[in-house]
């Protein structure tokens, strides 16, 4: 059932971009502004982004999902190409990953840092550096969102 809901949320044709961020955030109890901050950092909101890392791995889509997750994606019926062609899938999968890191580290900034730097104890400094950058972006995006909501 959970897989069906995940698929449904990712592929409903009328699902607008704003709804995609909000739905992913609601499903995993993550502020949509935080997801947007990560997307801004990871890809500059480029839904077609593909990047090769120093270790040879690749990151795909607006949320730069690493090919480390390829096996898991295939088990769920997805591919790396779908992360590009269906940006909402990328957003939902990223929210799912971030939620898993929050289960490991608690609902704090080290979990956000793990999204990029991973969970190795040796990567704590990198996690915190990434999290600081995301925090600044998050504050700006959240403030812009509040400002836009006041204009309505």
From Swiss-Prot:
Matches recorded under InterPro entries: Lysozyme-like_dom_sf (IPR023346), Transglycosylase_SLT_dom_1 (IPR008258)
Signal peptide interval: 1-17
Parts of the chain that traverse the membrane: none
Keywords assigned: Plasmid, Signal, Virulence
Keyword Signal on entry: yes
One Pfam family of this chain: SLT
Taxonomy, superkingdom: Bacteria
Protease is among the record's keywords: no
Assigned protein family: Belongs to the IagB/IpgF/P19 family.
Protein name, as recorded: Protein IpgF
Organism, scientific name: Shigella flexneri
């Amino acid at each position: 059932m959970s897989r069906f809901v995940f698929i449904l949320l990712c592929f409903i044709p009328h699902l607008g971009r704003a709804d995609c961020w909000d739905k992913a955030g609601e499903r995993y109890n993550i502020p949509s502004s935080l997801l947007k901050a990560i997307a801004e950092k990871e890809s500059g909101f480029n839904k077609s982004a593909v990047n090769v890392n120093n270790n040879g791995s690749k990151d795909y889509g607006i949320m730069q999902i690493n090919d480390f997750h390829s096996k898991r994606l295939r088990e769920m019926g997805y591919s790396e190409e779908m992360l590009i062609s269906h940006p909402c899938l990328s957003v939902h999968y990223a929210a799912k990953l971030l939620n898993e890191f929050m289960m490991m580290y608690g609902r704090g900034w080290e979990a956000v840092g793990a999204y990029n730097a991973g969970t190795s104890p040796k990567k704590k400094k990198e996690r915190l550096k990434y999290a600081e950058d995301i925090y600044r972006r998050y504050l700006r995006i959240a403030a812009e969102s509040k400002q836009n909501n006041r204009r309505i």
